[in-house]
Amino acid sequence: MSSVPPPATDRSATDRPATDCRVAERPAVDAAAFASEVVTAFQPVVLRGQVRHWQAVAAGRGSDRAMAEYLAAFGAPGGKPLDVMIAPPEVEGRFFYADETLTRFNFHRQQVPIGALVAELLRYAETDAALPHTLYANAATAPEHLPGWEGANPLDLGIDAPARLWIGNATRIATHYDTSINIACVVAGRRRFTLFPPDQLPNLYVGPLDHTMAGPPSSMVDPDAPDLTRYPRFADALTHAQVAELEPGDALFIPPTWWHHVRAFGRLNVLVNYWWEHRSGAAFLALVHAIGAVRDLPAAEKQAWHSWYEHLVFAPDAAQAADHLPPSARGILGPDSTDRTGRIRQFLINMLQRP
């Protein structure tokens, strides 16, 4: 980390949110209510105080130094270094593309032990300067990188997924979506999530699908300073936006495919999230394949395939489309199962390998 230049102060903590519309809130829930009420509603919701009992939250509410020392204590031998994104001061915490070609990013990556990362963040936090480099460790799985974290900070919502840590200073993460169900828990610092429903996709001006910063594609629009001349439809997206302001101990449930911009305020910020039901990621792969196989067909032919997609995929009764066949003959049109998933995978492999 010695190559990172001297630090600076965050000048952006007083910036106003993009909208006054707030995400719905409720108090902390137990596992039963989470499964039956929160997950099934398919709407974002703030769970106030959901993880206020965590040891890590107590450290985060204490001071930057207390938080840094708590994190460093998990840097035992055997813990893997973290993948850290490092951006120069002039990007003001916004990880994005470097220029109009969209071929390069405005940051680089470095493998850093947890102890070295928090020491650098603490040095930044305790130094009064103008504007810092931005450091951001993203999606570090606790079992691999911070062994012992999950035992000390249990979520208790019946989620079968590892805790993932996001550690940095004042960051701005471009509007993106996740293919999995997501619950994000703030440990230290303050987080602002700006969310857009899935149907706002056309108004978000999505960037490249196959050259992205961290997996999913991102909106090209900066919600903190939108260029409405270049991206006029984003004004419509803002009328549907919702904002969640989170303090340490709060959690936010985000349904899959909901777009969200994430902003962290402060000198040392820690968030823990959980993704599960990862199979939904296959839907994006199917979309990409459809772009190549269907999108550019002649209009009449494409309309014919639209009928197939509607009948077998999107119609309310699509799961019953093969009910006229005996169960033994339904094959990949049969009900969801591990066996069907394997058969579909093998069918696709066989088809894609043909000359």
Regions found by a protein language model. Give the residues of each.
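N-terminal accessory scaffold of Fe(II)-dependent oxygenases
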Residues: 1-10, 15-251, 259-355
